[in-house]
Amino acid sequence: MKKLLPILIGLSLSGFSSLSQAENLMQVYQQARLSNPELRKSAADRDAAFEKINEARSPLLPQLGLGADYTYSNGYRDANGINSNATSASLQLTQSIFDMSKWRALTLQEKAAGIQDVTYQTDQQTLILNTATAYFNVLNAIDVLSYTQAQKEAIYRQLDQTTQRFNVGLVAITDVQNARAQYDTVLANEVTARNNLDNAVEQLRQITGNYYPELAALNVENFKTDKPQPVNTLLKEAEKRNLSLLQARLSQDLAREQIRQAQDGHLPTLDLTASTGISDTSYSGSKTRGAAGTQYDDSNMGQNKVGLSFSLPIYQGGMVNSQVKQAQYNFVGASEQLE
């Protein structure tokens, strides 16, 4: 039942939109939603998780790289005083044709982002519940203080009347003492009520980040509710939309996918590689021209390459089998969360 409470509270808040009290409550919640650091952190974590989907997808897309080199060589003694300037540039393209681990990593990140999104929704529900609770605690504290103050005035009048009657000899001193004790008690109750109100206001400030000089009271006369559905129908609807159960199911799916990812460690990979490059080398020095063995000619070359890269893991010391077992144990643990 505790898991269903945030959803029921959220449904209740959505039904108050036509009431002036609900408008104020919704305004308070909107301020809490914008200023609450825990919810902002949860939103940032959710956005980061969805951004990681792009990172997980990137290895499946073409990888293009540009490289360039420059080398200057100054020769002396055995190098016959030959100087050289060499420049080269290359463009490399790599495209994954088959690599199941990369596809699996993308699926895992999508599921992880889904879990983070549910976590954010859960934090939203928690904030709704906390805001509504703090809001109504303030209203309740105001009512208690008002009642205590009214009670204090009534008891004070009773004390005044009893004192006057004692002065004319109509009652005993014990009646005055009893009335005084009641008045002292209600004074203490008033102090307690004021402290409770201050605490309730401070609790609301901690949630929303603002102090509110006035909060709208409940409009009981205009309060209307729809005809309630059968309890079983409400329970089924709440269980269907329960975020804790949804998060547990997504965690189970994630654990199941991690088993497949571990099993993919036995599969081969195939990549397409292509490159084009040019190089230019020039020589200078006193002996660049001379005997046949010491003649150096400038060169300018270009080269294109296309190839396939295939890899098949055969044995990795039992690591893959261990990873599969570990993932299976994690799946059992995630499944137990649904029980």
Regions found by a protein language model. Give the residues of each.
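Periplasmic alpha-helical coiled-coil/stalk elements that build and connect Gram-negative outer-membrane
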Residues: 3, 126-241
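Sec-dependent N-terminal signal peptides
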Residues: 4-12
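Bacterial Sec-pathway N-terminal export signals of envelope proteins
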Residues: 8, 20-69, 104, 211-256, ...
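N-terminal signal peptide c-region/cleavage motif recognized by signal peptidases
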Residues: 15-17
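Transmembrane beta-barrel architecture of outer-membrane proteins
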Residues: 27, 86-88, 133, 178, ...
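Extended amphipathic coiled-coil alpha-helical segments
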Residues: 41-59, 103-136, 140-164, 181, ...
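Small/polar-residue-enriched beta-strand and adjacent coil segments characteristic
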Residues: 63-76, 80-123, 246-258, 266-339
